[in-house]
Amino acid sequence: MEVFKDSDVLISTLGLDSHVWGKVPIYMTSGGFDPLHIGHARCILETTEMADADGGYVIVVVNGDGFLKRKKGGAFMPEEERAEIIAGLRGVDAVLIWDDGTQNV
């Protein structure tokens, strides 16, 4: 699946513009995934199972390197590698690397 750094590009690429928004279920989960552990895997699996039952999309938000630097002093793995791992998991439709300069997701 694809990795995005721009939410507008993600929305248009998946065809989730205004005429679809609100009609197709979108399931999202987020985390640092630095490194990916069993709790993350279970959370993503549960999210994909709910989306599968609903015919929805799964978007996983990966906290960017800047977010992790502010939170814990740095990242163990670069954001691109963490996002690539998540994108390779079954049921994940898209990954968004997110860092807006705050600790908000």
Predicted regions and their residues:
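Nucleotidyltransferase catalytic core that binds NTPs
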Residues: 1-105
